[in-house]
């Protein structure tokens, strides 16, 4: 059992009771909801005659089904419109804060909570979305939950959970040029596997993470779940505090000083005991691209697709399946693979720093003929900031479409979908079969900068070979 980790401290502080099952009844400090996993939960509350216990601890927005082109109401998709109306009514009925389209605060749930200062160190955070681990970048314990658990949080502000073990994932050194936070997490998942983190919370540590911005830390924590870890976090530090200071929901005045003192106290102790420790060298990480149908099937841009002998007996069947589905062969270089669609956005890489970096590679270049490329800001605030900096003009002049905020093609529960066998270069987080809207569509995951490189070349390309414009 680990001692002195942030995970242990936050877990213990939020423990209401230990249940006969051995699970912990855990108090949830912040509950985030959206239009997809909440309607049924509210219906279950109504059927049982229950109210939302602490409506002030729940914040809602719309993101999954939101169109990124024509957002006029009612939506053309009648089911999407019904889901929108259901969430609007539920929030009104229960007094829940709701950030709707046009409010200036709408966006992907895992983008808006941090940018508003709602996400803070030491919190327990739950959301009916598997990428809730994003918020761990602040030193919060955050995890995705199912619809019945959404109901439980609404009704009791608690969850019954089994405590996770803690694995320290340490990365040391300065990242090489052209290597980003997305490459770091893809490299970790490639090495530890998509099931390697099952039963664990990942504590991301080491000098590489100490140098990262909050946006970069969020990218890494976002994809903890792709590595099997339900929760991933980084200990809060001055970078965390500077990000939060002055944000709308962050503490102010004397409360701020008290908050920072407490946030520092929950950091993992120097002598904390972990259930496991793995160490990586930042210099071993290169621009990384997934080639298959799981986030663990990734390789460096200079590598070729591995043969079956590279995989364990247990992993060989899915590797064989990936070769066939992706129409790629062992020994084939990933560089030069033709792309049809290039997507920049999602809760993994739709923040302002992602767009700034991508724009520096797009500037002065042109999207290749036959390639559809588009950029979807993660929130209305991100969109407004990007436009104030003129980033939208850079993208549009390069041939990218500039869209409204939403989850977009990450999961294609909206009009943004692949068609047929199209192959997508995507800054999102999942590359499962059919993930981006077509049952036969194919997805390659990579950093936003690498997506721009692919868009310009019309094929998977090394961003290190693309000139970078001045900011």
UniProtKB/Swiss-Prot annotation:
<keyword id="KW-0100">Branched-chain amino acid biosynthesis</keyword>
<keyword id="KW-0028">Amino-acid biosynthesis</keyword>
<keyword id="KW-0432">Leucine biosynthesis</keyword>
<feature type="binding site">
    <location>
        <position position="347"/>
    </location>
    <ligand>
        <name>[4Fe-4S] cluster</name>
    </ligand>
</feature>
<dbReference type="InterPro" id="IPR004430">
    <property type="entry name" value="3-IsopropMal_deHydase_lsu"/>
</dbReference>
<comment type="pathway">
    <text>Amino-acid biosynthesis; L-leucine biosynthesis; L-leucine from 3-methyl-2-oxobutanoate: step 2/4.</text>
</comment>
<feature type="binding site">
    <location>
        <position position="407"/>
    </location>
    <ligand>
        <name>[4Fe-4S] cluster</name>
    </ligand>
</feature>
<dbReference type="InterPro" id="IPR015931">
    <property type="entry name" value="Acnase/IPM_dHydase_lsu_aba_1/3"/>
</dbReference>
<dbReference type="InterPro" id="IPR018136">
    <property type="entry name" value="Aconitase_4Fe-4S_BS"/>
</dbReference>
<keyword id="KW-0479">Metal-binding</keyword>
<dbReference type="Pfam" id="PF00330">
    <property type="entry name" value="Aconitase"/>
</dbReference>
<dbReference type="InterPro" id="IPR033941">
    <property type="entry name" value="IPMI_cat"/>
</dbReference>
<comment type="similarity">
    <text>Belongs to the aconitase/IPM isomerase family. LeuC type 1 subfamily.</text>
</comment>
<feature type="binding site">
    <location>
        <position position="410"/>
    </location>
    <ligand>
        <name>[4Fe-4S] cluster</name>
    </ligand>
</feature>
<keyword id="KW-0411">Iron-sulfur</keyword>
<protein>
    <recommendedName>
        <fullName>3-isopropylmalate dehydratase large subunit</fullName>
        <ecNumber>4.2.1.33</ecNumber>
    </recommendedName>
</protein>
<comment type="function">
    <text>Catalyzes the isomerization between 2-isopropylmalate and 3-isopropylmalate, via the formation of 2-isopropylmaleate.</text>
</comment>
<keyword id="KW-0456">Lyase</keyword>
<keyword id="KW-0408">Iron</keyword>
<dbReference type="GO" id="GO:0009098">
    <property type="term" value="P:L-leucine biosynthetic process"/>
</dbReference>
<comment type="subunit">
    <text>Heterodimer of LeuC and LeuD.</text>
</comment>
<dbReference type="InterPro" id="IPR050067">
    <property type="entry name" value="IPM_dehydratase_rel_enz"/>
</dbReference>
<dbReference type="InterPro" id="IPR036008">
    <property type="entry name" value="Aconitase_4Fe-4S_dom"/>
</dbReference>
<dbReference type="InterPro" id="IPR001030">
    <property type="entry name" value="Acoase/IPM_deHydtase_lsu_aba"/>
</dbReference>
<dbReference type="GO" id="GO:0051539">
    <property type="term" value="F:4 iron, 4 sulfur cluster binding"/>
</dbReference>
<keyword id="KW-0004">4Fe-4S</keyword>
<dbReference type="GO" id="GO:0003861">
    <property type="term" value="F:3-isopropylmalate dehydratase activity"/>
</dbReference>
<dbReference type="GO" id="GO:0046872">
    <property type="term" value="F:metal ion binding"/>
</dbReference>
């Amino acid at each position: 059992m680990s001692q002195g980790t942030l995970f242990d401290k936050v877990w213990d502080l939020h423990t209401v009771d230990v249940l006969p099952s051995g699970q912990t009844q855990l108090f949830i400090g912040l509950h985030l909801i959206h239009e997809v996993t909440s309607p049924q939960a509210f219906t279950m509350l109504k059927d049982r005659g229950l109210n939302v216990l602490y409506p002030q601890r729940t914040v809602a927005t719309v993101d999954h089904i939101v169109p990124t082109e024509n957002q006029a109401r009612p939506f053309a998709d009648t089911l999407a419109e019904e889901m929108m109306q259901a969430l609007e009514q539920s929030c009104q009925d229960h007094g829940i804060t709701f950030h709707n389209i046009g409010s200036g605060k709408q966006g992907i749930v895992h983008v808006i909570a941090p940018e508003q200062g709602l996400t803070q160190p030491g919190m327990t955070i739950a959301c009916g979305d598997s990428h809730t681990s994003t918020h761990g970048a602040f030193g919060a314990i955050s995890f995705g939950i199912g619809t019945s658990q959404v109901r439980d949080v609404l009704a009791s502000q608690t969850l019954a959970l089994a405590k996770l073990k803690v694995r320290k994932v340490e990365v040391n050194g300065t990242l090489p040029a052209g290597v980003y936070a997305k490459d770091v997490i893809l490299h970790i998942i490639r090495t530890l596997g998509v099931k390697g983190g099952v039963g664990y919370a990942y504590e991301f540590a080491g000098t590489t993470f100490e140098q990262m911005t909050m946006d970069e830390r969020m990218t890494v924590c976002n994809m903890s779940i792709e590595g099997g870890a339900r929760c991933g976090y980084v200990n809060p530090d001055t970078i965390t505090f500077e990000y939060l200071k002055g944000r709308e929901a962050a503490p102010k005045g004397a409360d701020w000083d008290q908050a920072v003192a407490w946030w520092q106290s929950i950091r993992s102790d120097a002598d904390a005991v972990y259930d496991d420790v793995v160490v990586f060298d930042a210099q071993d990480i290169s621009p990384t691209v997934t080639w298959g149908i799981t986030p663990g099937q990734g390789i460096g841009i200079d590598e070729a697709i591995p043969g079956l002998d590279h995989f364990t007996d247990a992993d060989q069947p899915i590797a064989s399946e990936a070769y066939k589905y992706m129409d790629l062969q062992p020994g084939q270089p990933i560089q030069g693979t033709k792309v049809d669609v290039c997507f920049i956005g999602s809760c993994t890489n739709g923040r302002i720093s992602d767009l700034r970096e991508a724009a520096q590679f797009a500037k002065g270049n042109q999207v290749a003929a036959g390639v559809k490329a588009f950029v979807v800001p993660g929130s209305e605030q991100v969109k407004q900031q990007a436009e104030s900096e003129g980033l939208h003009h850079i993208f549009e002049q390069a041939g990218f479409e500039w869209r409204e905020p939403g989850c977009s093609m990450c999961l294609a529960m909206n009009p943004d979908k692949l068609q047929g066998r199209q192959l997508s270069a995507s800054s999102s987080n999942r590359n499962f079969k059919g993930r981006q809207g077509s049952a036969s569509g194919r997805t390659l995951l990579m950093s936003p900068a690498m997506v721009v490189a692919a868009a310009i070349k019309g094929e998977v390309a090394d961003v290190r070979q693309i000139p970078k414009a001045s900011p």
